[in-house]
Amino acid sequence: MRLVFLGAPGAGKGTQAKRLVEKYGIPQISTGDLLRAAVAAGTPLGKEAKAYMDRGELVPDKVVLGMVKERLSQNDCKKGFILDGFPRNVAQAEALDKMLSEMNMPLDLALNLDVPFDDLMKRLTGRRTCKSCGQMYNVYYSPSKVEGKCDKCGGELFQRDDDKEETIRKRLEVYRAQTEPLIDYYSKKGILKSVSGTGSIDEIFNSICAILEKK
């Protein structure tokens, strides 16, 4: 089972991917993690990526694809994998398909975790963190008992700058602009499945498993 996991920031991809790893025993491959690990290990691709990052530039697709190829060549990917955070646009999807075809590992499924825009805004802008112990809350879904105070330690709750409304709105708009063509791309290939990302974690997970077990 080889799949790409699509979903906006705040859709809950990380939570669901973790549960899929536990249930099916296939690795979750995050390009962000791959980049950090390659840079830390000082691999040839890591050094190349670091040179771009040090200049404040985006790491080119060919470097990221090289890292993905190295990771997919490892034994734990033989039964399948979950690609998370890549591809982000159609050009990357086409390059990934070409590479996977050459490796004889074509994708089985592109899974889109679909959450309405307003829900994503609440999930992300509603986040609050305790300054003292790091405990997380959400003013809409899981508020603290006393507004602005941590239930665990009484510390002050704050909103991170990157959770402010304007920042989140921009992030979601960029995601939507990039990803709508990607959803169309996988739909035309006949491998796209969408799952509603609203409901309990268990309900969403059961919907995903029902799709995977039909494959």
Swiss-Prot record:
Keyword Glycosyltransferase set for record: no
Disulfide bonds: none
Domain comment in the entry: Consists of three domains, a large central CORE domain and two small peripheral domains, NMPbind and LID, which undergo movements during catalysis. The LID domain closes over the site of phosphoryl transfer upon ATP binding. Assembling and dissambling the active center during each catalytic cycle provides an effective means to prevent ATP hydrolysis. Some bacteria have evolved a zinc-coordinating structure that stabilizes the LID domain.
Biological role stated in the UniProt entry: Catalyzes the reversible transfer of the terminal phosphate group between ATP and AMP. Plays an important role in cellular energy homeostasis and in adenine nucleotide metabolism.
Top-level class of the enzyme under EC nomenclature: transferase
Superkingdom of origin organism: Bacteria
Chain residue ranges for the region called LID: 126-163
Region NMP, annotated ranges: 30-59
Protein name in UniProt: Adenylate kinase
Binding site for AMP: T31, R36, E57, L58, V59, G85, F86, P87, R88, Q92, R160, R171
Summary of subunit composition and partner proteins: Monomer.
Lineage, uppermost ranks: Bacteria, Pseudomonadati, Nitrospirota, Thermodesulfovibrionia, Thermodesulfovibrionales
